[in-house]
C-alpha cells in the first residue's frame, strides 16, 4: 500500500512500477501508481480537511511541524540511507540533505512571520491591518535530485500557512516520498491535510488538471514546467510556482589561487554528479597564461574523480546519476557537442556498463555555433574562452535560462558590474554556484522560473494577502466630501 489518502494507506490502481538502485540494480520499492479516480479522491480529502486545518491556531500547526522535525532527527540515519540508495548519491551527501530538511522547519516558521505575518498601522480613526490567508488545496510536485529536501521546502511552509496538500514525488524516487510521508503521519497530521499519490506523467497530468485545485508548486525540468504553465493558462485563480533548471555560467576572470578556483569549479559543476539545478554548465575562462594553467589543473583534478556506490568506504565525492538512462543522455550530449566542433578536454566515461556511474566530462566550445541552449543534467562542463570582461557577461547572459551565475575574481568592481548586468536570480562572487543561503530567496528568471522564488520567499506563494481598514466605532466624519448635505430639514 503506497498511497496515503485521507489518512489511510491504500494500494494504487494504476500502472505497476518498481524502483531500483541505479548502480547495483537492487530492487528498493514496488507499488502502483494512483489512477485518475484516486487522484481526485486525494483532492476531495484535502478539500474536506482544509476548513478545519486553516482555522487551527498557528501554534497548533507549528507544533505538528516541529514534531516532524524531531522525527527527522530521530530517523536521520534511516532516511539518509533511503535517499542515498534510491538516488545513488553518497551517504555523506544524503546526510546533508536530511540536515537541510530539519533546518528548514525553524527557517520556515521565521519566514512565515517575517513574510506573511500580521502587520497593523494605526490611523487617526482606526487601523490598517495586513493579514494572510491560505490558498486552499495545493499540489506539490517533487524532483528526484533532492527528493527529501526540495519537496520539504514547499510542504512545510504550505502547511504552516494553513493549506492542505497533495504530494506527488518523482516517479524516480517513490521510496523517499513514502518514507517522508510516514514521518508526517507519525507527527500527527489530521486525515486529509497531506495526501500522497505516486506515479509518473499520467498521474501528474491528472493532478494538474483538477478543477478543485487552488495551486501547484513545482520543482523540476523546464520542459515539464512549461507544460504545466500551458495546462494552467487561463486560470488566474490558481497559484503556480515553478522552479526549473538552468544553463548556468561560471566566469573565471582571475584565478590567482588556482587550486582554490579549481575546487570552487568542482563544487559548482560536479557535485551531486552534476544533478543540481544551480550547477555550472558553462565555464567562461579568460584567455591567457593564467587561464591556461587553471584549465590544465581543472582537467587534472577532475580526471581523478571516481564515482562510487552510496556506501563505499572511503566515501566518493560523487555517486551515480539517477539512472543509467540519465548517464547515457550525458554521453549523447557530449558526442553532440563534439560533432558541432567541440574539443574534448576530459572525456566522460561510464565506469560500468548498465550502471549510472559516470566520470566527469569537460569540452571546449570556443567559437562553436549552434550549441543547444539546454540543461544537461549531469557531470558535463562546457568551456568558452573570452578576452574582455564585457564579453564574459555577454556570454553569461546568452541563454534563455536565468537561475545562477558566478564570478571568480579579486576585483569588487567586476562583481558590481555583474550584479547590474547579470540576468540570474542567484549571483555569487568567489563562492560555488551550488551554494545558497536558506535565509535568501531561491529561484530564477526566464526559463528557470516564473518569479515565484522559494526558500525564504516560499511563504509568499503559500498565502494571499488580505488588507483591512477597521474601526471599533462607526462615526460621521467631521468634514464631509463636497456635494454631500447632511443638514436636517424642518418638517413642513
Swiss-Prot record:
Gene Ontology MF annotations: succinylglutamate-semialdehyde dehydrogenase activity
Gene Ontology terms: biological process: arginine catabolic process to glutamate; arginine catabolic process to succinate
Pathway involvement of the protein, from the record: Amino-acid degradation; L-arginine degradation via AST pathway; L-glutamate and succinate from L-arginine: step 4/5
Catalytic reactions on record: N-succinyl-L-glutamate 5-semialdehyde + NAD(+) + H2O = N-succinyl-L-glutamate + NADH + 2 H(+)
Similarity-based family: Belongs to the aldehyde dehydrogenase family. AstD subfamily.
Annotated PROSITE patterns: ALDEHYDE_DEHYDR_CYS (PS00070), ALDEHYDE_DEHYDR_GLU (PS00687)
Source species: Salmonella arizonae (strain ATCC BAA-731 / CDC346-86 / RSK2980)
InterPro entries registered for this protein in UniProt: Ald_DH/histidinol_DH, Ald_DH_C, Ald_DH_CS_CYS, Ald_DH_CS_GLU, Ald_DH_N, Aldehyde_DH_dom, SuccinylGlu_semiald_DH_AstD
Matching HAMAP family: Aldedh_AstD
Pfam families: Aldedh (PF00171)
PANTHER family: ALDEHYDE DEHYDROGENASE-RELATED (PTHR11699)
Function: Catalyzes the NAD-dependent reduction of succinylglutamate semialdehyde into succinylglutamate.
Top-level EC class as recorded in UniProt: oxidoreductase
Catalytic site positions: 243, 277
Gene3D superfamilies the UniProt entry points to: Aldehyde Dehydrogenase, Chain A, domain 1, Aldehyde Dehydrogenase, Chain A, domain 2
Enzyme Commission (EC) number: 1.2.1.71
UniProt KW keywords: Arginine metabolism, NAD, Oxidoreductase
Binding positions for NAD(+) per the UniProt entry: 220-225
Protein name per its UniProtKB record: N-succinylglutamate 5-semialdehyde dehydrogenase
